Protein backbone atom coordinates (compact mmCIF):
# COMPACT_ATOMS: atom_id res chain seq x y z
CA UNK A 1 0.00 0.00 0.00
CA UNK A 2 1.33 3.42 -0.92
CA UNK A 3 0.99 6.31 1.46
CA UNK A 4 0.25 9.69 -0.06
CA UNK A 5 2.98 11.50 1.84
CA UNK A 6 5.61 10.47 4.39
CA UNK A 7 8.05 12.88 5.99
CA UNK A 8 10.49 13.36 8.83
CA UNK A 9 12.41 16.38 10.08
CA UNK A 10 15.92 16.93 11.41
CA UNK A 11 16.58 19.72 13.92
CA UNK A 12 19.95 21.46 13.73
CA UNK A 13 21.51 22.88 16.92
CA UNK A 14 22.85 26.42 17.23
CA UNK A 15 26.30 26.83 15.71
CA UNK A 16 25.63 24.30 12.94
CA UNK A 17 24.68 25.54 9.48
CA UNK A 18 23.53 23.49 6.53
CA UNK A 19 22.70 23.84 2.87
CA UNK A 20 20.71 21.52 0.64
CA UNK A 21 20.87 21.63 -3.13
CA UNK A 22 19.75 18.77 -5.42
CA UNK A 23 19.75 16.30 -2.50
CA UNK A 24 23.38 17.10 -1.63
CA UNK A 25 23.65 18.13 2.03
CA UNK A 26 26.51 20.28 3.37
CA UNK A 27 26.79 20.55 7.17
CA UNK A 28 29.23 23.03 8.74
CA UNK A 29 30.10 23.23 12.42
CA UNK A 30 32.95 24.01 14.80
CA UNK A 31 34.93 20.88 13.82
CA UNK A 32 34.68 21.31 10.05
CA UNK A 33 32.44 20.67 7.07
CA UNK A 34 30.85 17.43 5.88
CA UNK A 35 29.15 16.74 2.55
CA UNK A 36 26.85 13.85 1.71
CA UNK A 37 25.18 13.03 -1.59
CA UNK A 38 21.66 11.54 -1.47
CA UNK A 39 20.89 11.85 -5.20
CA UNK A 40 20.45 8.09 -5.52
CA UNK A 41 17.29 8.33 -3.37
CA UNK A 42 14.23 9.91 -4.97
CA UNK A 43 12.80 12.15 -2.27
CA UNK A 44 12.43 15.83 -1.48
CA UNK A 45 14.72 17.67 0.92
CA UNK A 46 13.86 21.21 1.91
CA UNK A 47 14.73 23.73 4.59
CA UNK A 48 11.88 24.46 6.99
CA UNK A 49 12.57 27.55 9.03
CA UNK A 50 16.11 28.40 10.07
CA UNK A 51 17.25 25.20 11.81
CA UNK A 52 15.10 22.41 10.36
CA UNK A 53 15.35 20.11 7.38
CA UNK A 54 12.35 18.14 6.09
CA UNK A 55 12.80 14.91 4.15
CA UNK A 56 9.62 14.00 2.25
CA UNK A 57 8.53 11.14 -0.01
CA UNK A 58 5.31 11.13 -2.01
CA UNK A 59 3.55 7.82 -2.79
CA UNK A 60 6.30 5.67 -1.34
CA UNK A 61 6.29 1.95 -0.75
CA UNK A 62 7.72 0.38 2.39
CA UNK A 63 11.42 0.44 1.39
CA UNK A 64 11.25 4.04 0.22
CA UNK A 65 9.56 5.14 3.43
CA UNK A 66 12.27 3.36 5.46
CA UNK A 67 14.88 5.31 3.49
CA UNK A 68 13.47 8.56 4.90
CA UNK A 69 14.52 7.69 8.44
CA UNK A 70 17.87 6.39 7.14
CA UNK A 71 18.60 9.75 5.50
CA UNK A 72 17.65 11.59 8.69
CA UNK A 73 19.94 9.34 10.73
CA UNK A 74 22.84 9.99 8.35
CA UNK A 75 22.30 13.73 8.67
CA UNK A 76 22.18 13.47 12.48
CA UNK A 77 25.50 11.59 12.37
CA UNK A 78 26.91 14.41 10.25
CA UNK A 79 25.77 16.90 12.89
CA UNK A 80 27.45 14.82 15.57
CA UNK A 81 30.64 14.71 13.50
CA UNK A 82 30.89 18.49 13.08
CA UNK A 83 30.07 19.24 16.73
CA UNK A 84 31.56 16.47 18.90
CA UNK A 85 33.65 14.42 16.49
CA UNK A 86 34.28 10.68 16.47
CA UNK A 87 36.95 8.48 18.03
CA UNK A 88 37.75 4.99 16.81
CA UNK A 89 39.75 2.47 18.82
CA UNK A 90 40.98 -0.52 16.86
CA UNK A 91 42.88 -3.62 17.89
CA UNK A 92 44.58 -6.22 15.75
CA UNK A 93 43.47 -9.65 16.93
CA UNK A 94 44.77 -12.93 15.58
CA UNK A 95 44.25 -16.63 16.21
CA UNK A 96 47.29 -18.25 14.59
CA UNK A 97 49.39 -15.88 12.49
CA UNK A 98 50.68 -12.97 14.62
CA UNK A 99 49.84 -9.69 12.91
CA UNK A 100 52.38 -6.87 13.04
CA UNK A 101 51.05 -3.32 12.59
CA UNK A 102 53.39 -0.32 12.22
CA UNK A 103 52.91 3.38 11.51
CA UNK A 104 54.78 4.96 8.59
CA UNK A 105 55.07 8.51 7.19
CA UNK A 106 54.36 10.15 10.52
CA UNK A 107 51.08 8.31 11.06
CA UNK A 108 49.70 8.81 7.54
CA UNK A 109 50.15 5.16 6.52
CA UNK A 110 49.56 1.95 8.46
CA UNK A 111 51.53 -1.13 7.36
CA UNK A 112 50.07 -4.55 8.13
CA UNK A 113 52.52 -7.46 8.02
CA UNK A 114 51.82 -11.20 8.20
CA UNK A 115 48.08 -10.79 7.65
CA UNK A 116 46.71 -14.36 7.40
CA UNK A 117 50.30 -15.55 6.93
CA UNK A 118 50.86 -13.53 3.75
CA UNK A 119 54.39 -12.55 2.77
CA UNK A 120 53.41 -9.19 1.32
CA UNK A 121 53.14 -5.98 3.30
CA UNK A 122 49.76 -4.28 3.10
CA UNK A 123 50.08 -0.49 3.26
CA UNK A 124 46.86 1.30 4.22
CA UNK A 125 46.87 5.06 3.55
CA UNK A 126 44.82 7.09 6.03
CA UNK A 127 42.83 9.58 3.97
CA UNK A 128 41.52 11.61 6.88
CA UNK A 129 43.38 14.89 7.15
CA UNK A 130 42.45 15.46 10.83
CA UNK A 131 43.30 11.93 11.89
CA UNK A 132 45.51 11.31 14.92
CA UNK A 133 46.91 7.78 15.21
CA UNK A 134 48.55 6.44 18.37
CA UNK A 135 50.34 3.09 18.48
CA UNK A 136 49.60 1.35 21.78
CA UNK A 137 52.44 -1.07 22.54
CA UNK A 138 51.22 -2.67 25.76
CA UNK A 139 49.46 -6.00 25.21
CA UNK A 140 45.90 -6.35 26.42
CA UNK A 141 44.47 -9.72 27.38
From Swiss-Prot:
One Pfam family hit: Ribosomal_L6
Source organism per UniProt: Haemonchus contortus (Barber pole worm)
What is a biological process (GO) this protein takes part in? cytoplasmic translation
Q: Give the CC-aspect GO terms.
A: cytosolic large ribosomal subunit
Q: Which family does it belong to?
A: Belongs to the universal ribosomal protein uL6 family.
Q: What InterPro entries does this protein map onto?
A: Ribosomal_uL6-like, Ribosomal_uL6-like_a/b-dom_sf, Ribosomal_uL6_a/b-dom
**Molecular-function annotations in GO:** rRNA binding; structural constituent of ribosome
Record's Gene3D superfamilies? Ribosomal protein L6, alpha-beta domain (3.90.930.12)
What range does the record give for the signal peptide?
Answer: none
Disulphide bridges: none
Protein's UniProt name: Large ribosomal subunit protein uL6
Keywords from UniProt, A to Z, are:
Ribonucleoprotein, Ribosomal protein
SUPFAM superfamilies reported in the protein's UniProt record = Ribosomal protein L6 (SSF56053)
